[in-house]
């Protein structure tokens, strides 16, 4: 699988080393950064963790959690990407991943977690066959049972006719702030971004500690099964966030540019590295900008 993804040329996978996960004496690892909610490369400050439902805290940081844990919360149609209106024109589209609103477009400290559980497909289909028969026998007592039985049959027909893989899926957004006013703002912003995806925002309070604990890197085995929903693999991967922040080029020379999203300076090689990766075939430059935009600095 790793070779297939890497050979595509679009994205690359790399297995993390043990020191990158657990850290060293000089640098914190991924687990330590997650438990302190800090991405600093310096040694993280030890902080108390309060796991009380409704008011979970890590040090001075108060956490809020929004989840996508039910098919009722999802839009009627999922896609791999969407048109970003701000950077699109009538002649060109700027395409971002479907979950971009809760990724880089969410302007606050947050973690977007995506879970896809690949269980035994045959057992899932057998369980749904049994549930379908039970709901059919109870359909005379409630119309909702008849509707659910019809939906289950549609799911089973899709699985058998197209041979798609049934999976369990869950997504959540953990955001945090240190003061009450900022906390209310990020809670509203997260809900608004989920609504932009045409999802129903579900603000969780009671199960925040459980889902935070399950989100520790390598600890997905503690994830509560009742927080996931059944779907197919194709629909589940539509909820992945495919964007990342700009990163400095590994080249020893380049130009300092500003990250368009956050204004952070980034070291960029605009000549050798793009040619090495096959993005460009020559080093010609064309600079376009109004008067006073800094063209002469190039």
Label every model-predicted segment:
Residues 1-244:
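Extended, folded cores of ATP/NTP-driven motor/assembly subunits in large transport
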Residues 231, 236-265:
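Pre-P-loop entry segment of helicase/translocase ATPase cores
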Residues 252-298:
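Glycine-rich phosphate-binding loop of nucleotide-binding enzymes
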Residues 162-164, 246, 257, 276:
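Generic structural signal for short, flexible, solvent-exposed coil/loop and linker residues
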């Amino acid at each position: 699988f790793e070779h297939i993804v890497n050979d595509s040329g679009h994205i690359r996978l790399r297995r993390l080393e043990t020191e990158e996960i657990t850290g060293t004496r000089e640098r914190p690892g991924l687990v330590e950064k997650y438990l302190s909610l800090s991405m600093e490369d310096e040694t993280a400050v030890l902080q108390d963790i309060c796991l009380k439902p409704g008011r979970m805290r890590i040090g001075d940081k108060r956490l809020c959690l929004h989840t996508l844990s039910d098919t009722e919360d999802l839009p009627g149609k999922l896609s791999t990407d969407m048109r970003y209106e701000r950077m699109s024109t009538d002649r060109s589209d700027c395409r971002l991943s479907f979950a971009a609103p809760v990724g880089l477009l969410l302007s606050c400290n947050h973690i977007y977690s995506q879970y896809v559980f690949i269980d035994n497909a045959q057992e899932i289909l057998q369980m749904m066959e049994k549930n379908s028969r039970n709901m059919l026998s109870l359909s005379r007592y409630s119309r909702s049972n008849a509707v659910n039985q019809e939906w289950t049959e549609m799911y089973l027909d899709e699985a058998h006719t197209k041979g798609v893989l049934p999976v369990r899926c869950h997504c959540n957004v953990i955001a945090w702030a240190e003061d009450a006013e900022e906390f209310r703002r990020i809670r509203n912003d997260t809900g608004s971004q989920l609504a932009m995806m045409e999802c129903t925002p579900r603000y969780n309070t009671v199960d925040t500690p459980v889902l935070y604990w399950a989100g520790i890197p390598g600890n997905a085995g503690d994830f509560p099964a009742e927080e996931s929903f059944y779907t197919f693999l194709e629909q589940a991967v539509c909820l992945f966030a495919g964007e990342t922040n700009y990163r400095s080029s590994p080249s020893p020379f380049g130009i300092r540019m500003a990250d368009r999203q956050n204004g952070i300076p980034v070291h960029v090689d605009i000549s050798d590295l793009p040619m090495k990766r096959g993005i460009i075939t020559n080093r010609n430059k064309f600079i376009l900008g109004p008067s006073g935009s800094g063209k002469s600095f190039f």
